A protein has these predicted regions:
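Loop-helix junctions at membrane interfaces
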Residues: 1-212
Length: 212
């Protein structure tokens, strides 16, 4: 004889922990630590200026893709801040490095154009155009650099800005999520190019105004 249980059916629900804009805070802390640790690893050395580019700069976009714009920017910023404190030889102006990291994470997180933040790319693009204008304008109008030389000298920054502003940012996000390994590789290359270019632009404009 079987007896059916009576009473209200119970359901087990997993409680979410603390989050930053939907991203678990543990992820934010972990990836910020990764960025900080990679500050010790040189990616390239600039002999003329006596400084090096740390490998942490290569993962700024990756953090934004994983965590999203807000949490990604926070993790990159905190990681970069800790990085310049423990590896000061990798920066010229700490504030510039941190600002560049924050903007790279924010831009990378805004690439897919989905969700309630699908429109964030627009004000961010306007801000980046202003930053680029200040950067190139300082060279042309204050320091007398030929406009074509200023554009060629900032070609990485300008191309990254165009790739972000144009619908190519959506294409890059689609390729990153593709099951095709070749498309993923192209998306990773272009996405890293965009993030690195935006990071450099936002950091360089501060450095350029301070020293020029």
């Amino acid at each position: 004889m079987s007896i059916k249980p009576t009473g209200e059916e119970r359901a087990i629900k997993r409680r979410a922990g603390a989050t930053v804009d939907g991203a678990p805070i543990s992820y934010v802390i972990a990836l910020a630590a990764v960025v900080a640790v990679l500050s010790f690893v040189p990616l390239s050395i600039v002999i003329g200026s006596g400084k090096s580019f740390p490998m942490s700069q290569a993962v700024y976009p990756l953090v934004g893709w994983i965590l999203g714009p807000v949490a990604g920017a926070l993790a990159d910023g905190v990681g970069a801040l800790v990085g310049v404190l423990i590896a000061p030889h990798t920066t010229t102006i700490p504030a510039a490095t941190v600002f560049g990291a924050v903007m790279a994470g924010l831009a990378a997180g805004c690439m897919n154009g989905e969700g309630r933040r699908g429109w964030w790319w627009l004000p961010l693009s306007i801000l980046l155009f202003v930053v680029y204008g200040l950067y190139v304008g300082r060279a042309v109008f204050r320091n007398g650099v030929a406009w074509w030389a200023a554009l060629l000298g900032s070609i990485i920054d300008g191309s990254a800005l165009l790739l972000f502003v144009l619908p190519t940012r959506l294409l890059i996000a689609r390729w990153l999520a593709s099951e095709n390994a070749g498309l993923r590789a192209v998306g990773l290359f272009l996405g890293t190019w965009v993030g690195a270019g935006i990071s450099h632009l936002c950091a360089a404009v501060i450095v350029y105004y301070v020293f020029n």
